[in-house]
Amino acid sequence: MKNNSIRTVVATGIGAALFIIICIFVNIPIFGNTSIQLQYAVQVLFSVIFGSRSIIGFFMGFIGQVLKDGIQYGDISWAWVLASGITGLVIGLFGKKYDVTMGKFSVMSMIWFNLAQALGLLIAYGVVTPIGDKIQFAQAWSYLYAQSFVAGVANFITIAIGGTLLLAIYASSRTQSGSLTKG
């Protein structure tokens, strides 16, 4: 049990650090303070690999986004912090549907994965970010929903392409269950 706790803390720390670094240095602006964020593909990998402890995906996004906002903007948008965490959490919660640690990532697994990420992003960017930003920044609803929609779509595409590729590569690097036979 203690080993799992250490593994969880280390994975969360490494994941949050990668989240910040990728977010700050690989950033493609598209609308307002919204940009294509490639760190979500890496967050997906951590969320799925440590799916049984999906809290890693949550804290990777949560901590990473807090530090990134603080470093980059000097102000923290708590709705977007929560959205990053929720995205990792939801993807991790459904991780058993697309368990890449066994060396398989079938078309059906890819479909489940993308359905899970769509659900996570719908909650994060369809509900949490517009309402949270309205409370925190009192911006116009039309702007908030436009910004959230653009971010949600950009993140969906990023995760669908980058996340699926990372998971497929990871799965191909694992030994498939039952592929080794006794001689």
Curated annotation (Swiss-Prot):
GO cellular component: plasma membrane
Gene3D superfamilies per record: 1.10.1760.20
Hydrolase listed as a keyword: no
UniProt xrefs under Pfam families: ECF-ribofla_trS
Stored InterPro entries: ECF_substrate-spec-like, UPF0397
Annotated keywords: Cell membrane, Membrane, Transmembrane, Transmembrane helix
Membrane association type: Multi-pass membrane protein
Membrane-crossing residue ranges in chain numbering: 11-31, 44-64, 74-94, 111-131, 149-169
Main location: membrane
Record localization: Cell membrane
Domain of life: Bacteria
Similarity comment: Belongs to the UPF0397 family.
UniProt xrefs under NCBIfam families: PRK13661.1
Protein's recorded name: UPF0397 protein stu0306/stu0307
